[in-house]
From Swiss-Prot:
Alphabetized UniProt keyword annotations: Aminotransferase, Purine metabolism, Pyridoxal phosphate, Transferase
Annotated organism of origin: Bacillus subtilis (strain 168)
Reaction(s) this enzyme catalyzes, per UniProt: (S)-2-ureidoglycine + glyoxylate = N-carbamoyl-2-oxoglycine + glycine
SUPFAM superfamilies: PLP-dependent transferases
Taxonomic lineage from the root: Bacteria, Bacillati, Bacillota, Bacilli, Bacillales
Domain of life assignment: Bacteria
PROSITE patterns documented for this protein: AA_TRANSFER_CLASS_5
Protein's name in the database: (S)-ureidoglycine--glyoxylate transaminase
Pathway(s) the chain acts in: Nitrogen metabolism; (S)-allantoin degradation
Cofactor dependency: pyridoxal 5'-phosphate
Length: 416
């Protein structure tokens, strides 16, 4: 007889920039029965999900569907499908995840041109536009919301410049989709990649993407169908194409599954699609602008409490993400010890950071289902208590009052 017990995980208040707490309604649909990937009931769910993703990304693109895998899988699928060896790719970098784009692009043979700025700031769009005109890249790829630094980048002028210069504009919107405005068509974004485990409050395991006909044309020129399922017509029509390097991330083959052809590629992650559909449904049910305002509101309360405690926010405030708050670790305080005590004593998880910011800041997420008043008040109370135990010179008793002031003022304004 086995002594192994059934799995039972602890309850946590997750206030990181991802993953975040999963909405209970999403967890519920994940327990519904699995159906076959070609069952009309399932293909109907696929079609519904595509339609809802178009609303989420604010686009009329034909192609809006998820990649099975983490957010990074979505990023790699898009880049793998458009980059060919020796393509010039311009990547503006203002944090860790800009460097990730360079890692992926280089592995697919691109000539990568990096444009870097100080972590905690963003670029003047004109600096990027000048570089686009100078480099004349095939692709400009950049991050919309950089969770490593808590900054968000304006995209509209860059998208317009890319269209004028005939460069494909590919945007990592993993951390912003569902929590911040992402206007794919208006900002002239050619391809965008979202994440499930952040503002959508869905477990990690799918990456919603969308792309327009400019990208679809590049993919079509590289289209292949696997030998084991290709028809004679497929082989004749596609024989001269240079295939996309990756099989799993070949968007031309995934299009055949997500279109009327329903040609098999890989076994669909059924319960993850249920989860994504429900997560996006909840976003649209709340309403995009209402949801974005909720994130701004709770972030304002959190920031007010942090500052009232006597702590400093990190980075340029003019480009702060409304879903991630970066806090400078006070001098003489062990940041990891504070995080450990928060988790052990309060069940609260906040994040550290990476690279030049490792050991210098904490990152607190207010994303999706985790973005609630009770969570904001709880993390402020817990952080204050732990810092006092660490003999930090903070203003005791002021954080919660400052956050409550934000909530009460908002309530009074709503009543007017």
């Amino acid at each position: 007889m086995s002594g192994r017990r059934e799995l039972c995980t602890p309850l946590r208040t997750i206030m990181t920039p991802g993953p975040v707490e999963v909405d209970p309604r999403v967890l519920r649909v994940m327990s519904t029965p699995v159906v076959g990937q070609f069952d009309p009931a399932f293909t109907g769910i696929m079609n519904e999900t595509m339609e809802m993703l178009r609303e989420l990304f604010q686009t009329k693109n034909r192609w809006a569907y998820p990649i099975d895998g983490t957010s990074r899988a979505g990023i790699e699928a898009v880049l793998a499908s458009v980059i060919e060896p020796e393509d010039d790719v311009l990547i503006p970098i203002y944090g860790r995840f800009g460097y990730l784009l360079t890692e992926i692009a280089e592995r697919y043979g691109a000539n990568v041109h990096m444009l870097e700025c100080e972590w905690g700031t963003v670029f003047d769009p004109e600096d990027i536009i000048r570089e686009i005109k100078k480099v004349k890249p095939k692709i400009v790829a950049m991050v919309h919301g950089e969770t490593s630094t808590g900054r968000i980048h304006p995209l509209k002028a860059i998208g317009e410049a890319c269209r004028t210069e005939d460069a494909l504009f590919i945007v990592d919107a993993v951390a912003t989709i569902g929590g911040c405005e992402v206007k794919v068509d208006e900002w002239k974004i050619d391809a965008a990649i979202g994440g499930t485990q952040k503002c959508l409050s869905v477990p990690s395991g799918m990456a919603p993407i969308t792309y327009n006909e400019r990208v679809a044309d590049v993919i079509a020129a590289r289209k292949k169908v696997e030998r084991g399922i290709a028809t004679q017509a497929d082989r004749a029509a596609l024989s001269g194409n240079r295939p996309i390097t990756s099989n799993y991330f070949d968007l031309s083959q995934l299009e055949d599954y997500w279109s009327e052809r329903r040609l098999n590629h890989h076994t669909e992650a059924t319960t993850m699609l249920y989860a994504l559909r429900e997560g996006v449904r909840l976003v649209l049910e709340e309403g995009l602008e209402t949801r974005f305002e909720r994130h701004r509101h709770h972030e304002a309360a959190l920031a007010a409490g942090i500052k009232a405690m006597g702590l400093r926010l990190f980075g340029d405030d003019s480009c702060k993400m409304p879903v991630v708050t970066c806090v400078e670790i006070p001098g003489g305080i062990d940041g990891e010890s504070v995080r450990d005590m928060l988790l052990a004593q309060f069940g609260i998880e906040i994040a550290s950071s990476f690279g030049p910011l490792a050991g210098k800041i904490w990152r607190i997420g207010t994303m999706g289902y985790s973005c609630r008043k009770e969570n904001v008040l709880f993390v402020l109370a817990g952080l204050e208590a732990v810092l006092l135990r660490h003999n930090a010179g903070i203003e005791a008793g002021k954080a919660l009052q400052a956050a409550l002031d934000v909530y009460e003022n908002a309530g009074r304004q709503a009543a007017v």
